[in-house]
């Protein structure tokens, strides 16, 4: 007699593992992956600074290999858009990025149009993947809103090296995969890490500490004292606005409501459809991804099965 359900076929522990795999959402921080593979591409092949074909190979190789590794039921590829809402809160937000780009060996004036076009080509060819962005939102915002509002009961794996996303690990159904070190991120106390970052600031995003010259050690002391007691202490009232500013900039719980609603609507209305082999082949051919085209039969069924 053929056994017809999980209860008859597998142990309780195995059933749980299977159900988790069937409800696993893989969420890529698209810009994080793009820049990580871009600098690797230029380092390994400095001549790839005009058409960026080697970068395209590294990007897609990382993307597809990670999908195969985690075998998800759904894939989200989230990207930033220009003019983040955070600039209205703090005009110096990420002001250090342009300086870094100007010093970089990458020709960003040539890269950005290629990147924008490449994103649209992925969206067109890989029609079972949610390629998401929303005006004035960063990829972090898209990831955070979906994890908090749409993926509360699924097993979510966030693919990024960005430590800002550690706060999402407060919820036990969220994991973060570090593609550089090829391992799941270990974060013992994500809530405390978030509180420390709000107090000490984030140099990578040009967000200053709430009090000048306050690093992690100083932030630890403030937390031990109690943030409310610290801010109410005589002479410290001036730091309250800085604290409130940093909370809004860093804590995903302060993403504007209208932005969150827009992200959710964009996800819910996204036109997922069956993959057309001709579009996939055209994508691989146009972007000189010959080896991937040859291997499509190996990983293609998994990509086609996404929903």
Task: Walk through the language-model features, giving the residues of each.
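AAA+ P-loop ATPase catalytic core
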Residues: 159
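Non-catalytic nucleic-acid-binding/docking modules located in mid-to-C-terminal regions
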Residues: 2-10, 18-22, 69-79, 94-106, ...
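Noncatalytic, basic helical substrate-engagement surface that gates or grips nucleic-acid strands
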Residues: 2-12, 17-156, 165, 170-184, ...
């Amino acid at each position: 007699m053929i056994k017809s359900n999980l209860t008859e076929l597998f142990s309780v522990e195995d059933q749980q593992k299977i159900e988790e795999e069937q409800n696993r959402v893989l969420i890529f921080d698209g810009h994080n992956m793009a820049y990580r593979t871009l600098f690797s591409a230029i380092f390994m092949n400095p001549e790839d600074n005009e058409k960026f074909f080697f970068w395209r190979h590294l990007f897609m190789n990382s993307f597809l290999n990670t999908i195969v590794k985690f075998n998800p039921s759904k894939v989200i590829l989230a990207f930033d858009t220009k003019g983040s809402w955070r600039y209205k809160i703090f005009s110096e937000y990420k002001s250090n990025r342009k300086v870094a780009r100007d010093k970089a060996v990458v020709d960003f004036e040539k890269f950005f149009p290629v990147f924008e076009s490449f994103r649209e080509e992925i969206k067109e060819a890989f029609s079972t993947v949610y390629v998401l962005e929303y005006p004035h939102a960063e990829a972090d915002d898209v990831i955070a809103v979906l994890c908090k509002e749409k993926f509360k009961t699924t097993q979510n794996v966030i693919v990024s090296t960005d430590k800002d996303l550690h706060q999402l690990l407060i919820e036990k159904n969220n994991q973060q995969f570090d593609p550089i070190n090829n391992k799941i991120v270990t974060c013992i106390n994500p809530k405390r890490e978030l509180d420390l970052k709000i107090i000490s600031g984030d140099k990578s995003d040009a967000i200053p500490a709430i009090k000048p010259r306050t690093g992690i050690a100083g932030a630890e002391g403030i937390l031990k004292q109690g943030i409310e007691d610290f801010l109410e202490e005589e002479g410290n009232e001036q730091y309250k606005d800085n604290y409130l500013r940093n909370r809004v900039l860093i804590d995903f719980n302060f993403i504007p409501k209208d932005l969150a609603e827009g992200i959710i609507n964009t996800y819910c209305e996204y036109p997922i459809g069956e993959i057309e082999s001709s579009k996939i082949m055209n994508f691989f051919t146009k972007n000189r991804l010959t080896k991937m085209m040859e291997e499509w039969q190996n990983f293609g069924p998994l990509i086609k099965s996404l929903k």
